[in-house]
Design a protein with these regions (language model features):
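C-terminal substrate-binding subdomain of Rossmann-fold SDR/epimerase-dehydratase oxidoreductases
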Residues: 7, 16, 97, 172, ...
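Short, solvent-exposed loop/turn segments at secondary-structure boundaries
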Residues: 82-83, 177-182
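Nucleotide-sugar-dependent glycosyltransferase donor-binding/catalytic pocket residues
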Residues: 88, 178-179, 210
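A glycine/serine/threonine-rich, flexible loop-to-helix segment
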Residues: 124, 180-188
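Short, surface-exposed alpha-helical segments at coil->helix boundaries
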Residues: 38-41, 151, 187, 245, ...
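N-terminal Rossmann-like NAD(P)+-binding domain of SDR-like oxidoreductases, especially those catalyzing
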Residues: 1-173, 215-218, 291, 299, ...
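A short beta-to-alpha transition loop/helix N-cap that caps and shapes the active-site region
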Residues: 36-38, 119-120, 177, 244, ...
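Short, conserved glycine- and acidic-residue-centered signature motifs
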Residues: 91, 146, 182-183, 274
Length: 310
């Protein structure tokens, strides 16, 4: 099949590109390179089944494809708060453009949504049926509400125009090709440790997150797109729950550094806990994560060690 991946030069988009090329598909990788990097796709430039298109998903595009994966949007607070208006435009206009293309060419279209649609949840763990607790006017709202609006658009195009949609809600994901400057907790901790710096925890470190290794997540994407029964949304994440203190201690242990842990003020609207209920993915997709946190951290640390040395 001929597949369009928006955000295809990003952390997850580039890994999805690798997987779909291995599966025998032709890939059009679209990215404006705001947070994506040619470094992530440099190894693919000579592949005859791969095409890179530098284009912003908020601008209309016409292509002939069988499937569309919409991954285009800054996904870390550092990046999505840098230009909040651009962030929400990317989620909303990007969704409209992908859905319009899917309608025209009769393609199946996939939306990479987020656990941020649950906000600071009052239900734990979070099932897909939970509507969330989101501040609509806070500093994170450009991302949270943009993704919620994209889900609305996907379901309205599905109901009104019969567009064939799939939606996943991504929980914290990590692995090689994360940017060292993206401000996410795993990359922050690892980079600080490898540089011999103090590890910064915001708040007292009791807040929890669940960390899914990229290869598990990509497998969930593909399983959802390849079946004809389930539209979504589907939580894709690792239900193993860790405090920020536990994560920092693991990183210090696995890097073998002498970094100390220091604390700074907690940012506004930072969720206190986040853990996916993955029963739907397990029963309908036969999916569950395989990579344990320590195993994934070792691979990610090795990547960053090489990256920083270069």
């Amino acid at each position: 099949m001929r597949v369009l991946i928006t955000g295809g030069a990003g952390f997850l988009g580039s890994h999805l590109t690798d997987r779909l090329l291995q599966d025998g598909h032709e890939i059009i990788c679209m990215d404006n390179l705001f947070t994506g990097s040619k470094r992530n796709i440099a190894h693919l430039m000579q592949n005859t089944n791969f095409e890179f298109l530098r284009h912003d998903v908020t601008d209309p595009f016409k292509l002939e494809v069988d499937q569309i994966y919409n991954l285009a949007c800054p996904a870390s607070p550092v990046h999505y708060q840098y230009n909040a208006i651009k962030t929400i435009k990317t989620s909303v206009m990007g969704a409209i453009n992908c859905l319009g293309l899917a309608k025209r060419v009769n393609a199946r279209v996939f939306q990479a949504s987020t656990s941020e649609v649950y906000g600071d949840p009052e239900v734990h763990p979070q099932p897909e049926s939970y509507w969330g607790s989101v501040n609509p006017i806070g500093i994170r709202s450009c991302y949270d509400e943009g993704k919620r609006c994209a889900e609305t658009l996907f379901f309205d195009y599905h109901r009104q125009n019969g567009v064939d949609i799939r939606i996943v809600r991504i929980f914290n994901t990590y692995g090689p090709r994360m940017s060292p400057e993206d401000g996410r907790v795993v990359s922050n901790f690892i980079v600080q440790a490898l540089r011999g710096e103090d590890i910064t925890i915001y708040g007292d470190g009791s807040q929890t997150r669940s960390f899914c290794y990229y290869s598990d997540l990509i497998d969930g994407f593909v399983r959802l797109m390849e079946q004809d029964k389930l539209v979504g949304p589907v939580n894709i994440g690792n239900p193993g729950e860790f405090t920020m203190l536990e994560l920092a201690e693991k990183v210090i242990q696995l890097t073998g550094t002498q970094s100390r842990i220091v604390h700074e003020a907690l940012p506004a609207d930072d969720p206190k806990q986040r853990q996916p209920d993955i029963e739907l993915a397990k029963t309908e997709l036969g999916w569950e994560p395989r990579v344990e946190l320590d195993e994934g951290l070792v691979e990610t640390i090795d990547y960053f060690r090489t990256y920083l040395d270069s």
